[in-house]
């Protein structure tokens, strides 16, 4: 059996159409008042308020519940419809509805809508004539019932009374909106000017930082150039010292084996890396001192064998 949910879909469509109508009414009102707005913000705010009212008041659940009951009846399930009929015919339900009506009346009265205005609104409705400035006043069923019950009288001694109605002072409303707009404009300008000042300060700090970085980079480049020059000078000096020592070594009256040994130690000096060169010089000096020490010990032993003594003056 085909399951029908057309009533639920129609109720959901009516609720969605009501929301869209609320959005259109809100945006058109803002446009007529000359107020600039963000459509997405208006849409979000109206949707939030609409959903809250529909859910909190129970209107949405009530409509959807009745639609589900109708669909169930159309599908041959009359249990829910019978329960609703019994509920509507119950005296407690009638008392609850009367209580709700009385609450609504008191709420309208507290909002300044008195009994006279409520009765007139319930007895008459106004139909606008397309293309004309005039309107047609229509009597409702309540007015017809009052005529049949003789509850309508004609006052021949009618004295025009000023009806108390809520009027809107559009000039005052415009002045208020203009003040709010000017206040908002002033706050926006203040925030914009503050942002501009902060942006300028950030830009100045950035430029200053870039200048400092450029100066530091230039100083680093100078130090690098000085370091390279110093390294080249040290390499040149080390090479010159090694050459000078080799020349001096060749002029000495030493044996060829000693000269070859010292030259090998000099050739092992790293002339490209000054740090390694200093370590190599230290090693050469240690070896020379060690050789001198052994030579002195041998000389001292030879003197002792010859019955000579060695003194330092």
UniProtKB/Swiss-Prot annotation:
Q: Where is this region: Interaction with host EIF4G1?
A: 208-313
Segments forming a coiled coil: 166-237
Q: Which InterPro entries match?
A: NSP3_N_rotavirus (IPR042519), NSP3_sf (IPR036082), Rotavirus_NSP3 (IPR002873)
Tell me the domain of life: Viruses
Instruction: State the residue spans of region: RNA-binding.
Output: 1-149
- Answer whether the UniProt record assigns the keyword Transcription regulation to this protein: no
The UniProt entry's sequence similarity note says: Belongs to the rotavirus NSP3 family.
What name does the UniProt record give this protein?
A: Non-structural protein 3
